[in-house]
Amino acid sequence: MKNVTHSFVFLAHWPSAGSFGLNTNILATNLINLTVVVGVLIFFGKGVLKDLLDNRKQRILSTIRNSEELRRGTIEKLEKARIRLQKVELEADEYRMNGYSDIEREKANLINATSISLEQLEKSKNETLYFEKQRAMNQVRQRVFQQAVQGALGTLNSCLNTELHFRTIRANIGILGSMEWKR
């Protein structure tokens, strides 16, 4: 580019040889000078302008490619984040449901344990009442038996005299003696 600029400067200071020369005063230029200047500008400027436009185009395309890659990467990250969010929500729902089911299970277990304890207490109470009733009945039986024995002894003592007593003893000894010989 520096060479192109020096060429224009060189042409501008070129001494005119007669009829052809480069007039740098734009207002005093003629059509030929303008055509030459425009032609030189197009010839040399076309490459420079094309290089500038190509560089700009490459930068724009590169920026677009980078933006597309970033967009794809962002979309992938967003999809991964959505999938992860869904997994976390499912796990949270599962933990919540498991927590509720654990609470319900513990509640049912507690109710069952309490019910079993109440049944055992009721059974123990009934057994205790039964044993107390049996003990009271046994005590009554013992008293009745003792009173009956005492009454019978009293009756026997009052009815038996000494001779009747001796006769009963001899009869019992005779019965026992005959039982012994039979064996």
UniProtKB/Swiss-Prot annotation:
Record's bilayer topology term: Single-pass membrane protein
HAMAP family: ATP_synth_b_bprime (MF_01398)
Protein's UniProt name: ATP synthase subunit b, chloroplastic
Subunit field text: F-type ATPases have 2 components, F(1) - the catalytic core - and F(0) - the membrane proton channel. F(1) has five subunits: alpha(3), beta(3), gamma(1), delta(1), epsilon(1). F(0) has four main subunits: a(1), b(1), b'(1) and c(10-14). The alpha and beta chains form an alternating ring which encloses part of the gamma chain. F(1) is attached to F(0) by a central stalk formed by the gamma and epsilon chains, while a peripheral stalk is formed by the delta, b and b' chains.
Coiled coil regions, renumbered to chain: none
Organism superkingdom: Eukaryota
Keyword set, alphabetical order: ATP synthesis, CF(0), Chloroplast, Hydrogen ion transport, Ion transport, Membrane, Plastid, Thylakoid, Transmembrane, Transmembrane helix, Transport
Record GO terms (molecular function): proton-transporting ATP synthase activity, rotational mechanism
Misc: In plastids the F-type ATPase is also known as CF(1)CF(0).
Record field: transmembrane: 27-49
Tagged with keyword Hydrolase: no
Main localization of the protein described in the UniProt heading: plastid
Function, as annotated: F(1)F(0) ATP synthase produces ATP from ADP in the presence of a proton or sodium gradient. F-type ATPases consist of two structural domains, F(1) containing the extramembraneous catalytic core and F(0) containing the membrane proton channel, linked together by a central stalk and a peripheral stalk. During catalysis, ATP synthesis in the catalytic domain of F(1) is coupled via a rotary mechanism of the central stalk subunits to proton translocation.
Location in the cell: Plastid, Chloroplast thylakoid membrane
Recorded family membership: Belongs to the ATPase B chain family.
The UniProt record lists the keyword Nucleotide-binding: no
A GO CC term assigned to this protein in UniProt: proton-transporting ATP synthase complex
Cited Pfam families: ATP-synt_B
